[in-house]
UniProtKB/Swiss-Prot annotation:
Protein name per UniProt: Peptide chain release factor 3
Entries under Pfam families matching the protein: EF-G_D2, GTP_EFTU, RF3_C
InterPro entries: EF-G-like_DII, EFG_III/V, G_TR_CS, P-loop_NTPase, PrfC, RF3_C, RF3_dom_3_sf, RF3_GTP-bd
PANTHER family: PEPTIDE CHAIN RELEASE FACTOR RF3
Ranges where the tr-type G domain occurs: 11-280
Purpose: Increases the formation of ribosomal termination complexes and stimulates activities of RF-1 and RF-2. It binds guanine nucleotides and has strong preference for UGA stop codons. It may interact directly with the ribosome. The stimulation of RF-1 and RF-2 is significantly reduced by GTP and GDP, but not by GMP.
SUPFAM superfamilies: EF-G C-terminal domain-like, P-loop containing nucleoside triphosphate hydrolases, Translation proteins
Keyword Lyase attached: no
PROSITE patterns reported for this sequence: G_TR_1 (PS00301), G_TR_2 (PS51722)
Source organism: Pectobacterium atrosepticum (strain SCRI 1043 / ATCC BAA-672) (Erwinia carotovora subsp. atroseptica)
GO biological process: regulation of translational termination
Family, per entry: Belongs to the TRAFAC class translation factor GTPase superfamily. Classic translation factor GTPase family. PrfC subfamily.
Amino acid sequence: MSPSEYAREVSKRRTFAIISHPDAGKTTITEKVLLFGQAIQTAGTVKGRGSNQHAKSDWMEMEKQRGISITTSVMQFPYRECLVNLLDTPGHEDFSEDTYRTLTAVDCCLMVIDTAKGVEDRTRKLMEVTRLRDTPILTFMNKLDRDIRDPMEVLDEVESELKIACAPITWPIGCGKLFKGVYHLYKDETYLYQTGKGHTIQEVRIVKGLDNPDLDIAVGEDLAAQLREELELVQGASHEFELEAFLAGELTPVFFGTALGNFGVDHMLDGLIAWAPTPMSRKTDTREVTAAEEKFTGFVFKIQANMDPKHRDRVAFMRVVSGKYEKSMKLRQVRTGKDVVISDALTFMAGDRSHIEEAYPGDIIGLHNHGTIQIGDTFTQGEDMKFTGIPNFAPELFRRIRLRDPLKQKQLLKGLVQLSEEGAVQVFRPLTNNDLIVGAVGVLQFEVVVARLKTEYNVEAIYESVNVSTARWVECSDAKKLEEFTRKNELHLALDGGNNLAYVAPTMVNLNLTRERYPEVTFHQTREH
């Protein structure tokens, strides 16, 4: 393949994730984005929890029952001249580090806001994570077909609470029953709203020019006058769109619409294609790798068990950073130092898996994994280096896992270690007893673990409270001092799923006292994979 063909393939790629608070309409947006990309013909209406049509991106058993996305799915679809990779992240209040790690694999994010509610808690948390890497953000103000708050007020809230400048690209005309469409500030065009339900995309009527008398006829004189008045305010008070500020994560272009009504999503997608960065470079422990390099590199950011109930398999999701993946390619797994032949990588249309012949930077491919691949693994064509910035967070909640049938201890341990390698939960085995303690970022994770132990490992387990309030990974360069520390504190020490030593503290006070007592020991809140 010639360098110019390779460069063309790379420049076609856009890789993004959607971040939002639960119920802001993220799963609906995912559906509609795929619909506009023609990837699915019937956008499964998402909340029909009892019906058989489940949203294309929610496919694990528990998700199907609850109608929430728990695991991250990956979908690739064509849009205009580009190939878009969409990573769906759990939006439910209780989600895991999976979400955080997924954000390390994208080049851009779409923030979805319920315009009736404004900025909500989960959105704040996710924005903090995107901040760590200055990820560019586009914003979609959703649910304009309902009664909403004053759009100007919501923009102010985004700016003050999320510390990011807003540049409106479209502006709404009315809302709820009176929602008439949006005006595009940069094209001087009004797009009139006709509801499109399910998989019908209506032909949009366009009125050119803000002063066009046809606009008054189409939306009514009152709303047309209100629009002109609001736009004067908006243009005076808000930011102009600047590509550089957007790419630096300092400014977000804002689009208005209703995902459920299939309206406005395409304007946002057009913005994504025009402005979102092509595959970005990534740092390793030795140098920075750019997408233009011909040698293949990639990193694993997520592992998912049993994507196919018919196969007891696990799939490792790898983000391609540079080079072209080709079938039966030989790659070095840097952590183990072993060369492996990858003959059956997968591409994703959530839940449907098809084998692929090639992949380029920005693409996400799935590797079959029988326990040999871990989150954070780097694959190269021989170069020894490791991509950095894929974190393990110290859990915030802890439970003891207990068996109903004590004879299944072996299966329980196997299941928990596999789930911890997958990043679904973290496991701690105390040095002084046979307890198994699991740590998570949110309560729902414990339910997920118990449910999956039952369906995937045939182990009946229950979780109960345990006297642990926080955990820190410990490290000390002086082996003698570490040994002394271990001997004196073994009641509060445990090994995690990767056999790393961790201090499990009953209280924050205890942790702080121990820290003061052993200044030569480092207590880490995150650990690189």
